[in-house]
Amino acid sequence: MSNIPEKRPSEQPDEAEAKKPHIEPRHDHFAKGIAPIKAEFIVENPDVPVEEKYINDDEAEGGDRQEEEGGKGGKNKKRRGQNKKRDLKQQHEEVRLCSSLLDPENPKECRFGAENCRNSHNVEEYISSKPEDIEGNCPVYTAIGYCPAGLKCRWLHSHYNKETHKLLKDLEQVENAKALNNYEVNKITPDKKTSLQKKKYTFEYASQMIPYLDSLVQNEANIEKAQEQAKENQSTFVEAPFKVAEKKKLNLRDAKIVSPLTTVGNLPYRRLMKTLGADVTYSEMALSVPLLQGTNAEWALPKAHRTEYPGYGVQIATSKHWAAAKAAEAIYKEATHVSELNLNCGCPIDLLYRQGQGSALMEQPARLLRILKGMNASSGDIPVTVKIRTGTKENKNTAKALVERILSENEVAAITLHGRSRQQRYTKEADWSYVQDVANIVQDWNNKKEDNKELRDTQPTCFVGNGDVYTHEDWYNAVNIPGVDSVMVARGALIKPWIFEEVEAQQYLDKSSTERLEMIGQYAKFAIEHWGSDEYGVGLARRFMCEFLGFTHRYIPVGILERLPPKLNQRPPQWKGRDELETLLGSTDYKDWIKITEMFLGKAGPNFQFVPKHKSNAYEKS
């Protein structure tokens, strides 16, 4: 990884000590679990109870999967849960222009014909029906020198000559964008997607491996015995086409890692995090079966910005070894910019758990090992990694035994452990003492590999900790645990996107409201570049900006805290900022989040709807 210091701060005590921030003396008048905000910034007689301020942090791990998967029961199936009214449908234009006429100078042939097409072929009528353009220059045109949205662009005035009826193109900027790696990668071609949909895709690696994995199912209680039986029957035994030593090298030592995050961990967010110092990013969780069905929504998830690679991982969830093997092969062949393939064994969402995916795999180690074996054999030179929790039940940790089994199979390049059980969720702090115990197991395994002639040449298994990292002190305390190579940051990087800048500076950065707004503006530009500058793209960008602001508004400026360090699980009383903008950025009212989006995306249309996810269980119980 680039820009990673050779020595950690703890190895240079004098220097690190000098850089530590001044810690105010502790005051006991704050109730347990309440953020210690200075008295002059606390709002008297608040209109919002403390308990009702925030969305559920479990949603960052499962996001809209619960809504999407739960909606497969037909049109009239009742919506369940606290947020029955959460409707994410976005608005469309009153008059829809046929896509064949996006560029009036170079029209394409409409496959339906002008008379039969349900969209308009009258350019003048379309332009006159459009709402007033958004002020400023088109973010897409500014970034890449042309605008694929053409006449549909909401900033059309900035790249359209009304007199000549021509769209403008900046050829110099087109070349600059390529030189600056300003483009997206891992896009599956339409013909490959069609072959998946028609079940005609060729899985040369997975098809060899699946019969071998099937043979292991016969005796899951004793995998070693099953392997011996399979070897005796040469007709069913297949050697894995790739071994761990033949994979790309994966070095996560001291890397600044952003956790896989569903919904909020989208491409614009990850791209923003790369500009703020992140070394490693991950896709949103993709489900293996929809990938194999060639669905557009699922294949949108492995897409990445070119600046994310190297250091970009694709995360998948599955419950079947055949699906895992095939999905791994498809990603290897169709997504050319992937540094690692991560198996999600930590998602706590009930729906996936009931389907045997996510954290449910921790309860079925034999199935988990088969899945990892299938992925490893079918993913070409892409190393396979796994993300787990301490266990599925509270006060019953199982990760130690599971990690020992995973290591013995030698199928993964890295293991990430979230210091919580599935049942515990976010009501208590992560158990870093248990993370340390598991780190010792991985460290011992790596030491044994050094003494083993057969395994000596293979890469050591990286171990990454995860849970409640919100400050540079949290980060360094974690990476200085023996055996912990690095830390994966989730909520901390959503609430405070500049966390890695603080890690680099080894101090708290009291960002002004203006600086924070600039970051949000950068996100808006990246969002428009990704989703498009037409009405639909702007609606998507606005919706995901609101999801993002649903986390960033939780940041409490360090300058208004009575003592440090801040903690993720502390609930703040209602507070006001040092200026109006800071107060607005900390607002818990989603209508204020929409106002913030309007600073960059223009006025929200009357049909735009956004309802935040349901209340949170993310805070310590007082």
Curated annotation (Swiss-Prot):
Biased composition regions of type Basic residues, renumbered to the chain: 74-83
E.C. code: 1.3.1.89, 1.3.1.-
Record-annotated active site: 347 (proton donor)
A GO term, aspect molecular function: mRNA dihydrouridine synthase activity
SUPFAM superfamilies per the UniProt record, alphabetical: FMN-linked oxidoreductases (SSF51395)
Keywords from the named record: Cytoplasm, Flavoprotein, FMN, Metal-binding, mRNA processing, NAD, NADP, Nucleus, Oxidoreductase, Repeat, tRNA processing, Zinc, Zinc-finger
Subcellular location: Cytoplasm; Nucleus
Pfam family, one: Dus
Keyword Aminoacyl-tRNA synthetase part of the UniProt annotation: no
The reaction(s) this protein catalyses: 5,6-dihydrouridine(47) in tRNA + NAD(+) = uridine(47) in tRNA + NADH + H(+); 5,6-dihydrouridine(47) in tRNA + NADP(+) = uridine(47) in tRNA + NADPH + H(+); a 5,6-dihydrouridine in mRNA + NAD(+) = a uridine in mRNA + NADH + H(+); a 5,6-dihydrouridine in mRNA + NADP(+) = a uridine in mRNA + NADPH + H(+)
Region (Disordered), start-end ranges: 1-92
GO cellular component: cytoplasm; nuclear periphery
Keyword Signal in annotation: no
Enzyme superclass (EC): oxidoreductase
UniProt superkingdom: Eukaryota
Gene3D superfamilies (alphabetical): Aldolase class I (3.20.20.70), Zinc finger, CCCH-type (4.10.1000.10)
Cofactor: FMN
Major localization listed first in the record, in broad terms: cytoplasm
Compositional bias segments (type: Basic and acidic residues): 1-31, 50-72
Annotated positions binding FMN: 260-262, 315, 387, 418, 466-468, 490-491
Similarity annotation: Belongs to the Dus family. Dus3 subfamily.
Known role: Catalyzes the synthesis of dihydrouridine, a modified base found in the D-loop of most tRNAs. Specifically modifies U47 in cytoplasmic tRNAs. Catalyzes the synthesis of dihydrouridine in some mRNAs, thereby affecting their translation.
Protein name in UniProt: tRNA-dihydrouridine(47) synthase [NAD(P)(+)]
Source organism of the structure: Debaryomyces hansenii (strain ATCC 36239 / CBS 767 / BCRC 21394 / JCM 1990 / NBRC 0083 / IGC 2968)
Gene: DUS3
